[in-house]
Regions:
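Conserved "HGTGT" condensation-loop signature of ketosynthase/thiolase-family condensing enzymes
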Residues: 1-131, 139-145, 151-207
Length: 207
């Protein structure tokens, strides 16, 4: 059984986060305007978790674990690289664009910011990504590989995401939810039953 120490959530008003909101996120975390949009959305949920709980980047146990879950991941960066492959000769494509688009990069950015050294995972998929991510968190807590684990779910706005939503209704709009989970029963029980989207998961566990 898992318990929730803190939670945060952020979402766009019309499927996308406002530019001013993203600017505030970048300012809070010292991010460049060139930072991948997915990372900015991801950190937006972390900023809300900080604001709601009074925690900050120095509050985490250094052995804490991390899971970043997403249905599409940093699809904007992946698509940018694919577009360059189509538009330019292979030797003119920026390798750095692809290097920064791998699905593990957002998790790496969070571990650097929080200076946590526990197990870190990236989980991606559609129908059972959310369930798999939470089961992975529970397994790590039960095994004692980390005293607490930060689970962040995020989606960025994209043409691909819009197309997916037409055929897969549970697909989330541009949003992110963050949960700091523990096996310590002094905190409220983490509720997951019958939940298929980030916002519902957040509202079920906010106190």
């Amino acid at each position: 059984m898992m318990y929730c120490k803190a939670a945060g959530y952020i979402a766009g008003t019309e499927n996308r986060l406002d530019a001013a909101v993203l600017k505030n996120i970048r300012r809070e975390f010292g991010m460049s305007i060139r930072s991948p949009r997915f990372n900015q959305v991801l950190f937006g949920a972390l900023a809300d978790l900080f604001a709601r709980s009074g925690l900050n980047k120095d509050s985490f146990d250094k052995s804490a674990g991390l899971i970043v879950g997403s249905r599409l991941g940093p699809v904007g960066m992946v698509s940018a690289f694919q577009n360059e492959i189509l538009d330019y000769p292979e030797d003119q494509v920026m390798a750095g664009t692809f290097a920064n688009s791998v699905h593990n990069a957002p998790a790496g950015a969070v571990t650097v910011l929080l200076d946590i050294r526990g197990p870190a995972f990236s989980v991606m998929g559609f129908e059972d990504m959310l369930e798999q991510s939470l089961k992975l968190a529970e397994l790590n807590l039960e095994a004692g590989t980390c005293p607490e684990i930060l689970v962040i779910f995020a989606e960025e706005s994209s043409i691909i995401g819009d197309a997916v939503k037409e055929v897969y209704a549970p697909f989330d709009k541009e949003s992110a939810a963050a949960f700091l989970l523990t096996a310590d029963p002094q905190y409220p029980e983490f509720r997951t039953e019958g939940i298929s989207d980030y916002h519902t998961l957040f509202t079920a566990n906010i106190r």
